[in-house]
């Protein structure tokens, strides 16, 4: 299990106890700094004060459990307009929206695709309508995915 998934399982109860959805978390390095980025949401969106409240709660859990070696920066925010997609339920929730995905391994010489989310089946296979074809991808083959903000309406 990846460290991000371990962290997700560790902090999810604290986030949910406050009445928020833990959309996902990512652990990465930016220069010499380790960053734990946590995305939280609720119906109607989440504000700055609520993010601060969640940050304090997560910090308390992480201080006790100490799952990250060394120093790190905790960033808690809303997922934003181009929110990340992690689970089959995220894809289902945004059927009809445009997304960009990056695959773990290339398909037909390509790793990145953009298209409309049209379906997610019970086997957790995501179907995207690309410009000129349909792409079906098992969720486990997707390395990273985000919605594409549509400002044209």
Curated annotation (Swiss-Prot):
Annotated keywords: Cytoplasm, Ribosome biogenesis
SUPFAM superfamilies, per database record: YhbC-like, C-terminal domain, YhbC-like, N-terminal domain
Gene Ontology terms describing biological process: ribosomal small subunit assembly; translation
GO cellular-component term (any): cytosol
Keyword Cytoplasm: yes
Main location: cytoplasm
InterPro entries given in the database record: Ribosome_maturation_RimP (IPR003728), RimP_C (IPR028998), RimP_C_sf (IPR036847), RimP_N (IPR028989), RimP_N_sf (IPR035956)
Compartment list: Cytoplasm
NCBIfam families membership: PRK00092.1-1
Family to which the UniProt record says this protein belongs: Belongs to the RimP family.
Function noted in UniProt: Required for maturation of 30S ribosomal subunits.
PANTHER family recorded: RIBOSOME MATURATION FACTOR RIMP
Designated name of the protein: Ribosome maturation factor RimP
Organism: Coxiella burnetii (strain CbuK_Q154) (Coxiella burnetii (strain Q154))
Lineage per the UniProt record: Bacteria, Pseudomonadati, Pseudomonadota, Gammaproteobacteria, Legionellales
Gene that specifies this protein: rimP
């Amino acid at each position: 299990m990846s460290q991000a998934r371990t962290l997700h399982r560790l902090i999810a109860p604290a986030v949910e106890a406050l009445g928020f959805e833990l959309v996902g978390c990512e652990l990465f390095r930016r220069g010499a700094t380790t960053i734990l980025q946590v995305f939280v949401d609720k119906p109607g969106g989440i504000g700055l004060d609520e993010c601060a409240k969640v940050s304090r709660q997560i910090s308390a859990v992480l201080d006790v459990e100490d799952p990250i070696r060394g120093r790190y920066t905790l960033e808690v925010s809303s997922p934003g307009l181009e929110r990340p997609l992690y689970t089959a339920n995220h894809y289902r929730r945004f059927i009809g929206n445009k997304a960009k995905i990056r695959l773990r391994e290339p398909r037909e010489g390509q790793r990145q695709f953009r298209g409309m989310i049209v379906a997610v089946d019970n086997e957790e296979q995501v179907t995207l309508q690309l410009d000129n074809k349909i792409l079906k991808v098992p969720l486990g083959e997707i390395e990273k995915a985000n919605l594409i903000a549509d400002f044209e309406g």
